[in-house]
Amino acid sequence: MTKEEMQMAMVQPKSQRLRLLGTHFLMLCFIALIMFPLLMVIAISLRPGNFATGSLIPDQISWEHWKLALGMSVTHADGSVTPPPFPVMLWLWNSIKIALITAMGIVALSTTCAYAFARMRFRGKSALLKGMLIFQMFPAVLSLVALYALFDRIGQYMPFIGLNTHGGVIFAYMGGIALHVWTIKGYFETIDNSLEEAAALDGATPWQAFRLVLLPLSVPILAVVFILSFIAAITEVPVASLLLRDVNSYTLAVGMQQYLNPQNYLWGDFAAAAVLSAIPITTVFLLAQRWLVGGLTAGGVKG
C-alpha cells in the first residue's frame, strides 16, 4: 500500500468523526455530572461557617469543619472554643467494623450456599433458589417492624445480638445473601467439574476440593461480593437507625443525620463527615479493583 493510500485509509468519514465527538461530549457530561456533587461537598466542607450555598471554589479556606470531624476542638479569633459536636471518628470506626464483619460473613455464607446449589443435587433446589430471590426483592423497609420485634425478643436471650448492639445490625445485614448466592453460583457453574474430580481421585475430600481448588479460582467473584456487601453495609441507614439507639453506637451513615437538626443545619460539618465516609469505600475499591471487572462479567454467565 502506497503512502497516499494509507493516508486515505486513515481519513475518517465525517459522520464517524461527528459520532466520535458526540460520544466524547456525552462522556465528559457524564463525568461532570458525577464529579460536580463531590466537588461541591468538598467546597462546603472548606468554607467558613455552615452554609450550603456558595461558589465551587471557596473565597477563603477554613479547616474548622475538618478539625471538628476529626475530633479536635476549634479555637476562634475571639478566644472561644468549639468542641466537636459529635464523635465522628467513633462513628466511622463503627461503620468500618460492622461493614468488614458483615462483608466477610456474607462472603463465607454465600460461598458455601452457592457451592451446595451449584454442585449438589437435592430435592427442592430450584424452588428454594427462586424463593430466596423473590424474598430478596422486597425492600428492607417493609420488614422494619418485624426486625425490631425479632431483635427485641432475641436480645432477651442473647444480649450481644439484641437491640442497640452492633452484633444485631451485623446479624440483620447477613440475612440479605440471596442475590450474592445466585451470583457466586453462576460463577461456580463456569468452572469445569473435572478439576474437582481430579482432586477427588488424588484423595481430596469434598471440603478440600472446595477449599483448595474451587475457592482459589473464584477470587474475582468473591472480591465483587465483598465490595458490594461492604458498600451496602457502610451506607445502610433504615435498619441501623432502627436497631441502634445509643449515640456512641451509631454508624456514620446514621450519625450524620444529627447534623441536620431542623433548628440548626450544620452543613459544613456534615460535608466534612460525608467526605470522610467515602474514604473506606474508596480504599476497599482501589485494593480490589483488579478483580472487579472479571468477577462481574464471569459471575453473570449462566451455567
UniProtKB/Swiss-Prot annotation:
Superkingdom to which the source organism belongs: Bacteria
Q: Topological domains (Periplasmic): residue ranges?
A: 43-95, 151-159, 235-265
A biological process term (GO) from this entry? maltodextrin transmembrane transport
- Which SUPFAM superfamilies does the entry mention? MetI-like
- Self-association state and partner proteins as the record states: The complex is composed of two ATP-binding proteins (MalK), two transmembrane proteins (MalG and MalF) and a solute-binding protein (MalE).
Q: What does this protein do?
A: Part of the ABC transporter complex MalEFGK involved in maltose/maltodextrin import. Probably responsible for the translocation of the substrate across the membrane.
What name does the UniProt record give this protein? Maltose/maltodextrin transport system permease protein MalG
